[in-house]
Regions:
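N-terminal amphipathic, basic-rich helices that act as targeting or association modules
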Residues: 1-79, 215
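Non-catalytic terminal/interface segments that mediate subunit docking, oligomerization
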Residues: 65, 248-358, 363-373, 472-475
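A glycine-rich helix N-cap at a beta->alpha junction
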Residues: 86-96, 161-175, 369-381
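Active-site nucleophile and cofactor-binding loops and adjacent substrate-binding regions
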Residues: 39-48, 67-72, 100-120, 142-146, ...
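Glycine-rich ThDP/TPP pyrophosphate-binding loop and its adjacent helix/strand module
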Residues: 73, 108-265, 270-278, 282-283, ...
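Glycine/charged-rich beta-loop-alpha catalytic/anionic-binding loops adjacent to active sites
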Residues: 29-36, 97-111, 133-139, 313-328, ...
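Cofactor-binding active-site loop characterized by glycine-rich and histidine/acidic residues
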Residues: 41-162, 299, 304, 313-314
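Peripheral docking tails and interdomain loops at the edges
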Residues: 272-273, 386-388, 408, 529, ...
Length: 586
C-alpha cells in the first residue's frame, strides 16, 4: 500500500499520476474504516480526498500555508502530514482531534471548528507574509456550506484588495449540512452548468481571478489547476465541483445523514449502537411547532444550517413549507431576521446549538434586545455532557445570553416545564425570549407547570421547602440538586430547601430575602461556565449579608475532548462532592 510509505507531503510528491489515484483510494478506505468504527465527519472528508492529495502534491506545506474552513474536512490532510497512525490504528484513534490543531503538526495553522473563517484567517497570513517581505502561497479551503456565512463574504471582499498571492479553493459539493440555500448557490449552480464560463460570476464580481475544475474528484485535473495558480501574483478562486460522500454509496445517496455520523455499519449505514426509542427534545419540538404552524400561519421556524437541531428532517421541512427558513450558516442574519419577523407581527422560533449562538452576540444585543422584539430562541445542547471538542463547547451560553438587558432566558427542568415555556415564548408579545432546552434527556417531574411566565417574571419555584441549606438547581442541574438534597438529609439529617430558578436572567429578590430567615447557606448549580453565570448573580445579591454561598459550575477554560464525568468530578459537580463541601462550610 502506498499509504504506508506516506509520512509527509514529500512522500506524496514522489508518486506518479497513477499512484496518486491509488493513494486516493487507499486514503478513502482508511477514512471509511475509522469513521465507521469511531464516528466523525463522513461526507465532507470523503469528497475532499483527491483535492487534498493534489494540494500536497503541488504545494509545499508548511512553507505554503493551507487553511481549512471549519477544518472538519481535514482528515485526509492529517493522514498525509504524518498522522496516519491515528486513522489506521484503532488504539490511536483519539490521538488527533477532528479539526486542525497546531499542537499536532506544523502543517496546521489554527484551531478551527466554526464556519466561514478560513478566508479571513488566510488573508491575515498573506498580509503578514507581505509585511515581512516573505514568499510562499497562502491557500484557504472553503466549501460544504461555509460560503453562506457572512464572514466569508467579508474575507473575500478584503482579499480582493491584497494584490499579492492568495488562493481560495472553493469545495462546491452542492451541500451544507443539509441542502444549500440562497442566491450565492444559484450562481454556483450556473457556473457548474456553464463549466465556469457564465458572465455572471460571484468571484470575479468580488474582484478575484477565477478558475473552474469540472471534476473535483479527479486528481490529475486538480493537479493541473493547482499548478496554474501556484505562485500566482494576485487573488484567485479555484472552484472545484466535488461529490460529498464520494466513494461510499450510502453517503453519496444520503448526504445529510452522513454529514456527520456516530459509528455505523458499513454495509447498511445503520448506527452501530442503537439510539433506542427514547424521546428527544429536537424531535418533540418539531412535532409541536408543526402543529402550531397549522393553527397559525405566522409561526415560522428558523435554522442557520442545522435544521435537525430542533427536529426538522427533510420531510418536516417540506411539510412546513414557507413557514420554515434555512438561512445558511448565518446565525447573525438568523437572529436579526427573527427580530424583524417579530416586529412585523410574526412568531419566529430560531433553533440553534449552544456553541453557535455566540456567533450572533451583537445581533442578540443590538437587533433583538435593544428593540425588545418578542422573538423566541431555542438553545440546544447547553451543558458539559454534549459536545466536547474545544471548538464546539456548549458551556458559555448562560453568561453570553443571560446578561443582555430585556432578554428573558429560561431554564426548564423537565418536559412539562419546557413545553409550557415554549408555548408562552411563542405567543407572548412583550419580551425577547430564549429557552435553554434541557440537555439531560427528556424527563418528567409530574408537575403542572405555570402558564404565564410574564406574570411570574423572575419568580423562582420552591420545589421543596426545608431549612438551613437552600439548593438552587438551574435547568438540567435541577436533578443534581435533588440528589444533593437527598444525600445531605441522608448524611446529616438536614432537610434542605430545593429551588428551581426557572429564570437565568433574573433574581427573585423576595425569595432570596425570605431564605435569610431560616437558612445560612445557599448552593447554586449550573451546567455551564461559572464566570459571569447564574450563580454569581446570587452570590452578588448576598454579598453584604451573612449568607454563605457556594457556586458550582464549570471553571473558565477551553477544555478539549474531555470525558464528561471526569470534567464534572474535576469541578466538584457530583452530589457526593457537593455534600462534602456543604458539611465543611456549615
Amino acid at each position: 500500500m502506498y499509504i504506508e510509505k506516506i509520512n509527509g507531503p514529500a512522500d506524496v510528491k514522489r508518486l506518479s499520476a497513477g499512484e496518486l489515484e491509488t493513494l486516493s483510494e487507499e486514503v478513502r478506505g482508511v477514512l471509511l474504516k475509522k469513521l465507521s468504527e469511531h464516528g466523525g465527519h463522513v461526507g465532507p472528508n470523503l469528497g475532499m480526498v483527491e483535492a487534498t492529495v493534489a494540494l500536497h502534491y503541488v504545494f509545499n506545506s508548511p512553507a505554503d500555508k493551507i487553511v481549512y474552513d471549519v477544518s472538519h474536512q481535514s482528515y485526509a490532510h492529517k493522514i498525509l502530514t504524518g498522522r496516519k497512525a491515528a486513522f489506521m490504528d484503532a488504539a490511536a484513534y483519539d490521538e488527533v482531534s477532528g479539526y486542525t490543531e497546531p499542537s499536532e503538526s506544523e502543517h496546521d495553522f489554527f484551531v478551527i471548528g466554526h464556519t466561514s473563517t478560513s478566508v479571513s484567517l488566510a488573508t491575515g497570513l498573506a498580509k503578514a507574509r507581505d509585511l515581512k517581505g516573505g514568499t510562499g502561497n497562502v491557500i484557504a479551503v472553503i466549501g460544504d456550506g461555509s460560503l453562506s456565512g457572512g464572514e466569508a463574504f467579508e474575507g473575500l471582499n478584503n482579499a480582493a484588495e491584497l494584490g499579492t498571492n492568495f488562493i481560495v479553493i472553493v469545495n462546491d459539493n452542492q451541500m451544507s449540512i443539509a441542502e444549500n440555500h440562497g442566491g450565492l448557490y444559484r450562481n454556483l449552480q450556473l457556473l457548474r452548468e456553464t463549466d465556469g464560463q457564465a458572465p455572471c460570476n460571484f468571484f470575479t464580481a468580488m474582484g478575484l481571478d477565477y478558475l473552474y475544475v469540472k471534476d473535483g474528484n479527479n486528481v490529475q485535473a486538480l493537479i493541473d489547476a493547482f499548478r496554474k495558480v501556484k505562485d500566482i501574483g494576485h487573488p484567485v478562486a479555484v472552484h472545484i465541483n466535488t461529490l460529498k460522500g464520494k466513494g461510499y454509496r450510502l453517503a453519496e445517496q444520503q448526504q445529510e445523514r452522513f454529514h456527520y455520523s456516530a459509528p455505523f455499519c458499513l454495509e447498511t449505514g445503520s448506527p452501530s449502537v442503537g439510539s433506542g426509542n427514547e424521546d428527544d427534545y429536537g424531535d418533540l419540538t418539531a412535532k409541536y411547532l408543526l402543529q402550531e404552524m397549522k393553527k397559525d400561519r405566522t409561526v415560522v421556524g428558523i435554522t442557520a444550517g442545522t435544521p435537525t437541531v430542533f427536529g426538522f428532517t427533510p420531510e418536516r421541512r417540506e411539510e412546513a413549507g414557507r413557514q420554515f427558513v434555512d438561512v445558511g450558516i448565518a446565525e447573525e442574519h438568523a437572529v436579526a431576521m427573527a427580530s424583524a419577523i417579530a416586529a412585523g407581527g410574526g412568531k419566529p422560533v430560531f433553533g440553534v446549538y449552544s456553541t453557535f449562538i455566540q456567533r450572533a452576540y451583537d445581533q442578540l444585543s443590538q437587533d433583538l434586545c435593544i428593540n425588545n422584539n418578542p422573538a423566541l430562541i431555542l438553545v440546544f445542547w447547553g451543558g458539559a455532557s454534549t459536545m466536547n471538542d474545544v471548538t464546539h463547547l456548549c458551556l458559555f451560553d448562560i453568561p453570553v445570553i443571560g446578561n443582555i438587558p430585556n432578554m428573558v432566558y429560561l431554564a426548564p427542568t423537565c418536559r412539562e416545564e419546557y413545553f409550557a415555556m415554549l408555548e408562552w415564548g411563542i405567543h407572548q408579545t412583550e419580551h425577547p425570549v430564549a429557552i435553554r432546552v434541557p440537555a439531560n434527556g427528556v424527563l418528567s417531574r409530574g408537575i403542572e407547570p405555570e402558564k404565564d411566565y410574564g406574570k411570574l417574571l423572575n419568580r423562582y419555584e420552591v420545589a421543596h421547602r426545608g431549612g438551613q441549606v437552600a439548593v438552587l438547581g438551574l435547568g438540567s442541574f435541577f436533578q443534581l440538586g435533588e440528589e444533593v438534597v437527598g444525600k445531605l438529609k441522608e448524611e446529616t439529617g438536614v432537610d434542605a430547601t430545593l429551588v428551581n430558578p426557572r429564570f437565568i436572567t433574573g433574581v427573585d429578590e423576595a425569595l432570596l430575602e425570605d431564605l435569610k430567615r431560616d437558612h445560612t447557606l445557599v448552593v447554586t448549580l449550573e451546567d455551564g461556565v461559572l464566570d459571569g453565570g447564574f450563580g454569581e448573580k446570587i452570590a452578588r445579591y448576598y454579598g453584604a449579608s451573612g449568607m454563605k454561598v457556594l457556586n458550582y459550575g464549570i471553571r473558565k477554560e477551553f477544555a478539549d475532548r474531555y470525558d464528561a464525568g471526569e470534567l464534572l468530578r474535576d469541578n466538584r459537580l457530583t452530589a457526593l462532592q457537593i455534600v462534602e463541601d456543604i458539611k465543611k462550610v456549615r
